[in-house]
Design a protein with these regions (language model features):
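N-terminal secretory targeting modules
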Residues: 1-82, 239-265
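Alpha-helical cap/lid subdomain in secreted, periplasmic
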Residues: 2-11, 124-245, 259-260
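Phenylalanine-focused residue identity feature
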Residues: 19, 24, 39, 72, ...
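Short amphipathic alpha-helical segments, especially helix-boundary/capping motifs
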Residues: 71-76, 102-105, 166-169, 204-208
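Conserved SGNH/GDSL esterase-like catalytic core that processes O-acyl groups on lipids
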Residues: 73-158, 183-185
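Mobile, glycine- and charge-enriched loop segments
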Residues: 84-121, 218, 222-265
Length: 265
């Protein structure tokens, strides 16, 4: 009888040892699939759960890589957008490149070029509001300031017009592209930076940004303007207040509906 108990005990110990070994062994034994045992998880903890990579983002949003100190909860709005791009003659170079981005990423784009325009020219009219009503954009780009680099006392003379433009834009997400200075300005960039909210203003005049100039010495060449737009679009996806999909296009430029306004008198 004693030998029988000893034999049963040995068999139980052998079975337990085999169970423990299989629990730690892994996911397969030769060609047989073996589910990792919960016993091993109890002993060493479920390391696979702690080390699991995050699940992919939903279809409506996509996670964006962040620079140090940025909000890691920020996501990209992946919906197709109806974009309105308004501004001065800088749109001649920027517009076709943004059109290529729009075409590549499924957006629609309307460019409105008002030659020689300024914040005052736009802000003393309701033109912006009219174009918003006509084209119903859900995202706006603005490129203004190049004709105001040397305006003295600019806050006293331009702030109210800038405020009126922002009032016309309302709650529509937008990005304001600052001018590509060819000389130091008298305050236009500072006024824009201090008036607009974080992530709404792209400062184009920084030491690390280079511009090849056209014959007038002010406007960037077509190639340089395209590179400028590339930087803006990359910034929109990474750092702007409302990030949209702007993957770099294969085409260098594209056509879109464009409205031309003569210089204001």
């Amino acid at each position: 009888m004693k030998k029988t108990y000893i034999g049963l005990t040995c068999l139980l110990l052998l079975a337990l040892a085999l169970f423990v070994a299989l629990s730690f062994y892994g996911d397969s034994l030769e060609r047989w699939h073996i589910k990792t045992g919960s016993f091993a998880r109890v002993l060493i903890g479920d390391t696979t759960r702690r080390q699991r990579t995050p699940s992919s983002a939903t279809d409506s949003t996509r996670a964006v890589s962040q620079a140090p100190g940025q909000d890691f909860s920020q996501t990209v709005d992946t919906a197709r957008k109806s974009i309105l791009f308004i501004g001065d003659s800088m749109l001649e170079g920027l517009g076709p490149r943004l059109a290529a981005y729009a075409e590549e990423n499924g957006h629609t784009l309307v460019n409105v070029i008002w030659y020689s325009s300024t914040t005052e020219v736009w802000g003393r009219t309701e033109k912006l509001k009219e174009y918003i009503a006509e084209y119903q954009p859900d995202y706006i780009f603005v490129s203004l300031g190049g004709n105001e680099l040397f305006v003295s006392n600019i806050r006293d003379r331009r702030q109210k017009y800038l405020d009126n433009m922002l009032s016309q834009i309302g709650d529509i997400p937008f990005v304001w592209i600052g001018p590509p200075n060819w000389k130091p300005d008298t305050g236009i960039n500072e006024m824009l930076a201090e008036t607009l909210r974080p992530g709404q203003f792209y400062l184009s005049y920084t030491p690390d940004q280079h511009y090849d100039r056209a014959r007038d010495g002010a406007h960037p060449t077509r190639a340089s303007a395209s590179a400028w737009m590339d930087r803006v679009c990359a910034w929109v996806m990474r750092e702007s207040a409302h990030r949209i999909v702007l993957h770099r296009p294969k085409a260098a430029r594209a056509h879109c509906h464009t409205v031309i306004l003569a210089p204001a008198k």
